Regions:
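Internal helix-turn-beta structural module
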Residues: 298, 302-318, 323-326, 332-398
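Catalytic phosphate/nucleotide-handling subdomain of diverse soluble enzymes
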Residues: 218, 224-256, 265, 329-360
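Glycine-rich phosphate-binding loop of actin/hexokinase-like ATP-binding domains
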Residues: 150-254
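Extreme N-terminal starter segment of soluble prokaryotic enzymes
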Residues: 1-4
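Adenine-nucleotide phosphate-binding core of ATP-dependent small-molecule kinases
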Residues: 265, 272-276, 283-318
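Short glycine-rich, Thr/Ser-proximal phosphate-binding strand/loop in the N-terminal lobe
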Residues: 12-56, 228
Length: 399
């Protein structure tokens, strides 16, 4: 089975074609600046990668160009679009309506529209991509894979906010969690590496990048996660503030005399590592500035590492123990200094990492546990596209 994985933004289209017999990537690419004059497509297949200008008034034309790239020229990876057996779409927010991946129907699209207020920056773009793909690919089965679905096993005591209950009943105000596809992939990958059924494991998965979240996975089910109703909550991130005293919102709004939209921009795009350091939203730049003596950059780094350590500790308490901690994402996979600082002084919990292994992790799964430590510590390269493809294959085969 060949599965085309799609991740649509408002002006972008990321794709990957995977042959599920061996889970081999046949091609991948990115359409950028859709709807703008300077739109382009980057396509990679057969060891050949090229970026070419193109005209994409809408996502429909972008999909048509993707088909052209896949079936002709140096980037050809299939003879005809009919070779694609299924299409998996990443959808950010499934609310309480979608607790697992599902076949896309007219009714599903309508429900996604109803959920758009919960993810106004992401869900409309996902719907746009689904509708454009239907025009280009016709009757090829399509599956929606939700970022929120893996977290749907959280109990009410973990997902409810302590505000009037009717706001949950009427408006769906609660914790949902995100990065679920990544958390699911690395949790199952960890279980495979540890040679234990996931149903016997207590795992803490740390997806750390420009957007970051942590999940407590007990016996294969998420029991808590750091992001909330939106991806703004939890840890501080590249440009997002993370958890905040709700009264700060009103205080800033009236003190600065700004609109709710303007404040939303500040909290989502001007805060986090960027807001504290004043240097960059990129952790690498922040660490470089900190090493050069920039105190604000050092503070930003210290804050993030502290918040991650604190969250890990709270989840160990919630699960009454932990078997393994998994680091993934841009920071989680590549920032040895961050991993070392996060795990420092956690010996009393059984967490201790090997300094040399931590400096140079090798392969898709690398264990950096120090000799004698009770808790296993792993660095795992996430693969959200493959997880989406697996879910898509499972849904289509069981329809």
């Amino acid at each position: 089975m060949k599965v085309l994985v799609i991740n649509c933004g408002s002006s972008s289209l990321k794709y990957q074609l995977i042959d599920m017999d061996g889970e081999k990537v046949l091609c991948k690419g990115l359409c950028e600046r859709i709807g703008m004059e300077s739109s382009m497509i980057t396509h990679e297949a057969n060891g050949h990668k090229a970026t070419t200008p193109a005209i994409f008034p809408t996502h429909t034309e972008a999909f048509a160009e993707v088909v052209k790239k896949m079936t002709t020229g140096e980037g050809k990876c299939i003879n005809d679009v009919s070779e694609i057996d299924a299409i998996g779409h990443r959808v950010v927010h499934g609310g309480e309506k979608f607790k697992s991946s599902c076949l896309i129907t007219d009714e599903v699209i309508e429900t996604l529209r109803e959920l758009s207020p919960l993810a106004p920056l992401h869900n409309p773009a996902g719907i746009l991509g689904i509708e454009a793909a239907r025009k280009v690919f016709g009757n090829i089965p399509m599956v929606a894979v939700f970022d929120t679905a893996f977290h749907s096993t959280m109990p009410p005591k973990a997902y409810m906010y302590a505000i009037p209950y009717e706001y949950y009943e009427k408006y769906g105000v609660r914790r949902y969690g995100f990065h679920g596809t990544s958390h699911k992939y690395v949790a199952y990958k960890a279980a495979e590496y540890l040679e234990e059924p996931i149903e016997r494991l207590k795992l803490i998965t740390c997806h750390l990048g420009n957007g970051s979240s942590i999940a407590a996975v007990d016996q294969g089910k998420v029991v808590d996660t750091s992001m909330g109703m939106t991806p703004l909550a939890g840890l501080m991130m590249g440009t997002r503030c993370g958890d905040l005293d709700p009264s700060v919102v009103n205080y800033l709004k009236y003190t600065l005399n700004i609109t709710g939209h303007q404040l939303d921009e500040i909290l989502n795009k001007k805060s986090g590592l960027l807001g504290i350091s004043g240097v960059s939203s990129d952790k690498r730049d922040v660490e470089e500035a900190a090493a050069a003596g920039n105190k604000r950059a050092q503070l930003a780094s210290d804050m993030l590492n502290y918040q991650i350590k604190k969250t890990i500790g709270s989840y160990i308490a919630a699960m009454r123990g932990v078997d393994a901690i998994v680091f993934t994402g841009g920071i989680g996979e590549h920032d040895a200094i961050a991993r070392a600082k996060i795990c420092h002084h956690m010996d009393w919990l059984g967490i201790r990492i090997d300094t040399e292994k931590n400096k140079h992790p090798q392969g898709d799964v690398c264990e950096i546990t120090a000799w004698g430590a009770k808790v296993r510590t792993l660095v795992i390269a996430t693969d959200e596209e493959l997880m989406i493809a697996r879910d898509t294959k499972e849904v289509v085969e069981n329809k």
